Amino acid sequence: MYVKELFVDNFRNLQKQKIEFCEGINIFYGLNAQGKSNLLESIRLLSMGRSFRGSKTTELIKFGEDYFYVKAIICQENNDKKIEFGYKKNENKVIKVNGNKIKSTSELLGQLLTVIFSPEDLNIIKEGPSHRRKYLDSCISVVEKNYLYNLMQYNKILMNRNKLLKSIKEGKSKSILEIFDDQLVEYGAKIIVMRQNYLKNVEINIKKFLLEISNETAEIVYLNSVGLKDASDEEIVKKRLKEKLSKNIDVDLRYFTTQVGPHREDFKIIINGYDSRVYSSQGQQRTAALCLKLSEFEILKKETSEKPVLLLDDVMSELDENRKKYVLERLKGFQTFITHTTKRDLKGDCYFKISNGVVIKE
């Protein structure tokens, strides 16, 4: 799988243009704030249906305009596939695959497989549990077709349960709570099992990568909401989650929120026996984040039997020569997009200069 060409119109600061890419390593260079990251963002948008920077869809429109449109031609097994994403202010976004409009962004997942590497990856390690849950949900959604559906159903039931907790406090009967709990357990257990299985694969990869890069040991500890060391048996997880919800009801009623479940989970990356978020140096944390993304790439490749497209947004300047060489070696044979301030110290198959939103192929 690779991106043959990209067309952008009114996307961020990028000028209206069509760009043709190489199958190998594509280097985009130029000064800061010229549009390098915006180019990668447009490709990632066609892959995931949202900005990797966390921006709202309306914020992707070029200043002074009222719409944007992005289109890519993807080559997959010698067949071309067209993906389009358009949005106009105060209207619904329009996403099409081969000319057919899709109903939700969830249908877009898997059409263009990408892995994004950026300096913000460090936040997965350094910040709070919500960052790691969000990252985990994003990764699993691409390789497990039912994961996003289960997550959406769970969140909907969770919201209704929290509303009910407040109503009970105000005098409503507790009897209906059991119905919500059964539904929450049903979807929650599926989420927990999928997370457990995914993190097992992550651990295998991270152990290998960290040992090869810096000769350090690593393990993943899944802090699941049911208190199990191995939460891969769905029936056992259901039973434990139901017990936890029942046991915690008084606390839930006190705070009007559900205190137990996948929405409160976390995972730790342990380096040399210590929690990397708390005890590792920034260099170790950066290496852990890099290994996490390389693991995402390996799992995506294995589970889909496809070649994902790699997007490296200004990460090479953050790596020493040893890590830079290791990353490029791992990504050999895959279409890769790399943004950098200069082309001098990177070897690529195609070079593009970006200035004021104009992409010039050399």
UniProtKB/Swiss-Prot annotation:
It holds the Pfam family SMC_N. ATP binds at G30, L31, N32, A33, Q34, G35, K36, S37. GO terms for molecular function: ATP binding; single-stranded DNA binding. GO terms for cellular component: cytoplasm. One of its GO terms (biological process) is DNA replication. It comes from the Bacteria. Coiled coil: none annotated. The keyword DNA repair applies. PROSITE patterns: RECF_1, RECF_2. Keywords: ATP-binding, Cytoplasm, DNA damage, DNA repair, DNA replication, DNA-binding, Nucleotide-binding, SOS response. It is found in: Cytoplasm. The keyword Nucleotide-binding applies. The RecF protein is involved in DNA metabolism; it is required for DNA replication and normal SOS inducibility. RecF binds preferentially to single-stranded, linear DNA. It also seems to bind ATP. NCBIfam families: recf. PANTHER family: DNA REPLICATION AND REPAIR PROTEIN RECF. Belongs to the RecF family. This is DNA replication and repair protein RecF. It comes from Thermoanaerobacter sp. (strain X514). The lineage of its organism: Bacteria, Bacillati, Bacillota, Clostridia, Thermoanaerobacterales.
